[in-house]
Structure formats: structure tokens, C-alpha cells
Curated annotation (Swiss-Prot):
Residues 135-244 are annotated as: Interaction with EVI5. This is F-box only protein 5. Changing residue 145 to N: Not mitotically degraded. Shows impaired interaction with BTRC and reduced phosphate incorporation. Residues 261-409 are annotated as: Requires for efficient binding to CDC20. Residues 437-447 are annotated as: Sufficient to suppress UBE2S activity. GO terms for cellular component: cytoplasm; cytosol; meiotic spindle; nucleoplasm; nucleus; spindle. Residues 337-358 are annotated as: Disordered. Zn(2+) 1 binds at residues 378, 381, 396, 401. Residues 322-325 are annotated as: Competitively blocks access of APC substrates to the D-box coreceptor formed by FZR1 and ANAPC10. Changing residue 345 to A: Substantially impairs inhibition of CCNB1 ubiquitination by UBE2C. Residues 305-447 are annotated as: Inhibits APC ubiquitin ligase activity.
Length: 447
């Protein structure tokens, strides 16, 4: 029997493993010998190797250098039993520094880092655009004054510059005011009013400097008029002054909660004193409801106490000179006080008895005198009598006498009639001329 090579239905690709001849059976078909069995096993291994190699090369991934040493000495389970050439290729790639990782490991790593990679790509794309980078820079608080672009000159005419300035100023001012009105969109919420105003003005000037390098003061006034920058709350204007009205300054700035805290610490009498300082302080007191209620109650209580303890609450206080109605008020007041003074004198005379002298009697009456009154001796009993020089009236204070007379005519006191009908009081001695007059000088010359 002649020997011929084994013929299979599927001829595998050429491999490094050589096929050995096989014997032919009695039926005319070749008997699979040991070499043929080895060939078939090699074929299956080769096919598996080709499949696995292609799958691995389709999913290559570079690993960090720290993991190279660990992966060089490691042979994956799917390469066991494969051909020597594939194992050599695997070892060669691992020595270069780009080891092959299992497809399962590659799939797990890509799934775990997929979200992170997308975020990085999104951030990188946003940072690549110059417009968004400039917007990100302007959102931070830089110390740029806004005048750095004034050196840029443009060849535009004055008419074009004016029209472009108006359009650009309207857009920039509207965007700045939108940032002011919507605090959620404004990045720096904790800016002081001065820094806030500085940022808006500088950004507006920086945008308009390319069109017109000149500073337009009308534009600044319009920014101040449109935007609510709270510049009235700026502190430091009164620094260095000796006297500062703190309450008035707080009232002008609208800090009513601070004023309410201050007024709550004051007592009712202190609130009365606050109202007497100035009209502004009284307005501050009237603006606070709680403090004003306490103040009004204190005023009512003080007035009631004054009316209760004042001996002359029914009339006005006595003064030296009054209007023509003073005589009527005097007569009304004297009738009410006449009985009280007489009872006091009688009680004092009974207590002291014989030791009560004339001097003590006059001194006791003198304690009850008013500002425009004086003491005189009664024309009937020589007892102390009160004398009013404005009314020309004297009243005896002795209980047994009580004579009320006119000092001009020495008659009973008359309020409506004149003293012309009665006899006038004649002086007991003639009064000489006043010193320094012509008559006194003549008398001196005669002497």
C-alpha cells in the first residue's frame, strides 16, 4: 500500500506544526495515526489561538509603567496551549512596555471610567473656546481697573464712534444691570457697595474703550442712576470729625433696625430727653412705634404729676409784668389762697404762744411771698400785709383784721373804679429833687 498525505475536508491554514503521513484503512480511507491525531489537535489549538489573538489585538490598552513588571511574568489563561509564535509575540510586546490586557479587564475599565472621561472631554471642549475662557476670567474678581485697553486706537470717525458707543453702552449697561437685579446670576454676592460699583463701571469702560477711548461722564451718571448700588451706605465719610450725629446718620441711611435696637435700651425719661434734642431725633422717635408709645405714656404721666402737685395749676405762674388781664387773674388767685394763709398763721400763733414775736410773724409771712410781692404794715393794726406793686394793693394777713385796701387812696380795694373820687394819700414829708437834676444843682450853688 502506498502512503499519501492526509486529506481533510477543511484545510487549515499553514502552521509551524508539520503534518505527518497517515495509514490507509481497508476501506480505502486513511487511518488516523498518531501524527494525524497530533495534527488535528494542533489544528484546533491554532484556530483557537488565531481567534484569541485577533480578539486581543482588537482591544489593546496601554497600562501604567508600575504594572509592567507584574504583567511581564504573567501569562493569561487564554494563551495557554497556543502556538509558540503567539506566545513570543505576547512576550515581545510586554517587554516593549505596552502589555496586552485581558478583554474582560479592558471592558471593565472602560465601563468604570466612562463618565469621568466624558466629563474631562466636556471640560476640555469648553476650555478650548476663547469666548468661554474670557467669560470665566471675567466672572472672577480681578484687580484690573478697566483702563488697560485705552491705548488701543481705532480709525473710526466721530459719528461712527458715537453710534457704536451708544449701542455698545446700552448692551453692556443692560447686561451689568441684569447682574445687579438677579443676585443668583451674580458671581460675587458678598461684595461691598464700592467694589460692586467699581466692577460694573470698569467692565463697562473696558468694553467701550475699543470704540471710544475717552471717558464719558454722562455714561457714568447713567450707570449710577439706573443701578441700585447702595452708595449711601458707604462708611468713612465722617472720619476725623470731632462731633458726629450717629442717630441722624443711621436715619438717613435707612438703618431702622439699628435705631430700634438703640431706642429699646433707653428708659422713658431718656426718650423724653431724646425728643428735646432736635427735630430729627423726634422724627426718629416717632418712626419707632414701640419707643413712641413708651414716650407718649411717659409724657402723660409727667404732665399728670405736675398738675397734681402744682399749687397754681388753675392759673399761670406769677410774673412781674403781664398783659391787662393780669389784674383779673390776680384777684381770682388771691381769693382761693386767702383762707389757707390765715389758718396757717393762727395755728402757728397758738402753738408758740407768748414767745411768738413780731419779727417771727413777719418772717413767716415772708416765706409765702411771690416774686412780685413785698411786705408792708397794715394801716389799721400794723400787722404784716402783702403788697403787690403792680396792682397797688395790700392785704393784711392777721386773722382778726384781714383788711384789703388800695395803697393809693387807702380805701377798700376796688378793681373797676379809679381812685380819682377818693382822697389821695398825702406824703408826710416832701421829697426833694433827685440828685443830678437842675434843681439839685441850683440848690448846691446856693449853698
Amino acid at each position: 500500500m502506498s502512503r499519501r498525505p492526509c486529506s481533510c475536508a477543511l484545510r487549515p491554514p499553514r502552521c509551524s506544526c508539520s503534518a505527518s503521513p497517515s495509514a490507509v484503512t481497508a476501506a480505502g480511507r486513511p487511518r488516523p495515526s498518531d501524527s494525524c491525531k497530533e495534527e488535528s489537535s494542533t489544528l484546533s489549538v491554532k484556530m483557537k489561538c488565531d481567534f484569541n489573538c485577533n480578539h486581543v489585538h482588537s482591544g489593546l490598552k496601554l497600562v501604567k509603567p508600575d504594572d509592567i513588571g507584574r504583567l511581564v511574568s504573567y501569562t493569561p489563561a487564554y494563551l495557554e496551549g497556543s502556538c509558540k509564535d503567539c506566545i513570543k509575540d505576547y512576550e515581545r510586546l510586554s517587554c516593549i512596555g505596552s502589555p496586552i490586557v485581558s478583554p474582560r479587564i479592558v471592558q471593565l475599565e472602560t465601563e468604570s471610567k466612562r463618565l469621568h472621561n466624558k466629563e474631562n472631554q466636556h471640560v476640555q471642549q469648553t476650555l478650548n473656546s476663547t469666548n468661554e475662557i474670557e467669560a470665566l476670567e471675567t466672572s472672577r474678581l480681578y484687580e484690573d481697573s478697566g483702563y488697560s485697553s485705552f491705548s488701543l486706537q481705532s480709525g473710526l470717525s466721530e459719528h461712527e464712534e458715537g453710534s457704536l458707543l451708544e449701542e455698545n453702552f446700552g448692551d453692556s449697561l443692560q447686561s451689568c444691570l441684569l447682574q445687579i437685579q438677579s443676585p443668583d446670576q451674580y458671581p460675587n454676592k458678598n461684595l461691598l457697595p464700592v467694589l460692586h460699583f467699581e466692577k460694573v463701571v470698569c467692565s463697562t469702560l473696558k468694553k467701550n474703550a475699543k470704540r471710544n477711548p475717552k471717558v464719558d461722564r454722562e455714561m457714568l451718571k447713567e450707570i449710577i442712576a439706573r443701578g441700585n448700588f447702595r452708595l449711601q451706605n458707604i462708611i468713612g465719610r465722617k472720619m476725623g470729625l470731632e462731633c458726629v450725629d450717629i442717630l441722624s446718620e443711621l436715619f438717613r441711611r435707612g438703618l431702622r433696625h439699628v435705631l430700634a435696637t438703640i431706642l429699646a435700651q433707653l428708659s422713658d425719661m431718656d426718650l423724653i430727653n431724646v425728643s428735646k434734642v432736635s427735630t430729627t431725633w423726634k422724627k426718629i422717635l416717632e418712626d419707632d412705634k414701640g419707643a413712641f408709645q413708651l414716650y407718649s405714656k411717659a409724657i402723660q404721666r409727667v404732665t399728670e404729676n405736675n398738675n397734681k402737685f402744682s399749687p397754681h395749676a388753675s392759673t399761670r405762674e406769677y410774673v412781674m409784668f403781664r398783659t391787662p388781664l393780669a389784674s383779673v387773674q390776680k384777684s381770682a388767685a388771691q381769693t382761693s389762697l386767702k383762707k389757707d394763709a390765715q389758718t396757717k398763721l393762727s395755728n402757728q400763733g397758738d402753738q408758740k404762744g407768748s414767745t411768738y414775736s413780731r419779727h417771727n410773724e413777719f418772717s413767716e409771712v415772708a416765706k409765702t411771698l411771690k416774686k412780685n410781692e413785698s411786705l408792708k404794715a397794715c394801716i389799721r393794726c400794723n400787722s404784716p400785709a402783702k403788697y403787690d406793686c403792680y396792682l397797688q394793693r395790700a392785704t393784711c394777713k392777721r386773722e382778726g383784721c384781714g383788711f384789703d385796701y388800695c395803697t393809693k387812696c387807702l380805701c377798700n380795694y376796688h378793681t373797676t373804679k379809679d381812685c380819682s373820687d377818693g382822697k389821695l394819700l398825702k406824703a408826710s414829708c416832701k421829697i426833694g429833687p433827685l440828685p443830678g437834676t437842675k434843681k439839685s444843682k441850683k440848690n448846691l450853688r446856693r449853698l
